[in-house]
């Protein structure tokens, strides 16, 4: 079985976002706007946390897959590419975690 990556999933999200199909769950989410996508992402994140707290490995894996999907949909809704997130991660990993945290802008 070929390895399925986040890039594969991002490409699927992109393709479904561009489709005119009413049967696409991805398209329906995006059509409802970024706020809806953010809310759905939050719901899935909470479900993932609950699965982790309950120590339910199978459920945690399933909910994590949902979180990753909804994260990519949310990013798409705001025009952010996975590669931009990867660049931010690469920049952060070039220094220690404490240095990186100290370098962040404060609100």
UniProtKB/Swiss-Prot annotation:
Which reactions fall under this protein's catalytic activity?
A: 1-(5-phospho-beta-D-ribosyl)-ATP + H2O = 1-(5-phospho-beta-D-ribosyl)-5'-AMP + diphosphate + H(+)
Keyword terms: Amino-acid biosynthesis, ATP-binding, Cytoplasm, Histidine biosynthesis, Hydrolase, Nucleotide-binding
- Pathways involved: Amino-acid biosynthesis; L-histidine biosynthesis; L-histidine from 5-phospho-alpha-D-ribose 1-diphosphate: step 2/9
Which InterPro entries would you find in this protein's record?
HisE, PRib-ATP_PPHydrolase-like
- Lineage top rank: taxon: Bacteria
Q: Name one Pfam family in it.
A: PRA-PH
Group of enzyme by EC: hydrolase
- Protein name, as recorded: Phosphoribosyl-ATP pyrophosphatase 1
Source organism of the structure: Rhodopseudomonas palustris (strain ATCC BAA-98 / CGA009)
From the broadest rank down, the organism's phylogenetic lineage runs: Bacteria, Pseudomonadati, Pseudomonadota, Alphaproteobacteria, Hyphomicrobiales
